[in-house]
Design a protein with these regions (language model features):
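Active-site loop immediately N-terminal to the catalytic Tyr-X3-Lys motif
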Residues: 20-27
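Residue(s) in the substrate-gating loop at a strand-loop-helix junction
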Residues: 15
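Rossmann-fold scaffold of SDR-type NAD(P)-dependent oxidoreductases
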Residues: 12
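Active-site-adjacent segment of SDR/Rossmann-fold oxidoreductases
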Residues: 2-4, 20, 41-53
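SDR active-site lid
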Residues: 45-123
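Conserved cofactor-binding/catalytic machinery of classical short-chain dehydrogenase/reductase
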Residues: 26, 34-37, 104
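Short-chain dehydrogenase/reductase
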Residues: 39-40, 109
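Active-site helix of classical SDR
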Residues: 31
Length: 152
C-alpha cells in the first residue's frame, strides 16, 4: 500500500473487549487489546509519514454470531483442554443469551463503511453499554482506582 502511493484504508477488527475487560475473558481481552494498540500505533505512524492510508479499528459489542459455538472447530485431541469450569460455563451461557439480542452483522458492516467514509478511527456500534463500560474503565484509570466489576 505504501509503495503504490494510492489512497487506502485499513480496518482491524477488535471487540469491545479491546477497550474494556471482563471476568473469564482474559485471553480474549488480551488479544483484542493488542489489536487496538496495533491499530493506534499504525494510525499514528501513517499520520507521521503523511501516507494517504487511513486506519480504523472496529470495536463492536454484541453481534449475532456463532462465536459461542467456536469449540465445534477444536481438534478432537484438544477437546478436553477446552472444557470450562462451572462458573465459566454459567458466564458463557449468559453471554450466549445476550448475543442473541445483538446487532445483525449487516448493520455492523454498514457502520464500518460509514466509519471509513467519515475517517473515524474508532468504529464502535452505538450500544449504550459499550460506551458506559469504556467510560467506567477510563475513569478508573484517571483516578488510579482498582478495576470496577460491571454487573449485568
Amino acid at each position: 500500500m505504501l509503495g503504490g502511493g494510492d489512497e487506502g484504508h485499513i480496518v482491524n477488527t477488535a471487540s469491545m473487549a479491546g477497550l474494556t475487560t471482563a471476568p473469564f475473558m482474559s485471553i480474549y481481552d488480551v488479544t483484542k487489546h493488542a489489536v487496538v494498540a496495533l491499530s493506534e500505533s499504525m494510525y499514528k505512524e501513517l499520520q507521521v509519514t503523511g501516507a494517504p492510508i487511513g486506519v480504523s479499528v472496529l470495536c463492536p459489542g454484541l453481534i449475532v454470531t456463532n462465536i459461542m459455538r467456536s469449540a465445534r472447530n477444536r481438534p478432537e485431541d484438544l477437546a478436553e483442554a477446552g472444557k470450562a469450569g462451572p462458573m465459566a460455563q454459567t458466564f458463557g451461557q449468559a453471554l450466549s443469551d445476550r448475543l442473541a439480542g445483538g446487532y445483525p452483522p449487516s448493520e455492523v458492516a454498514d457502520q464500518v463503511v460509514a466509519g471509513i467514509r467519515e475517517g473515524r478511527f474508532y468504529v464502535v456500534p452505538a450500544q449504550p453499554e459499550v460506551k458506559s463500560a469504556i467510560g467506567i474503565r477510563a475513569q478508573d484509570l484517571i483516578e488510579l482506582k482498582n478495576p470496577t466489576l460491571r454487573r449485568g
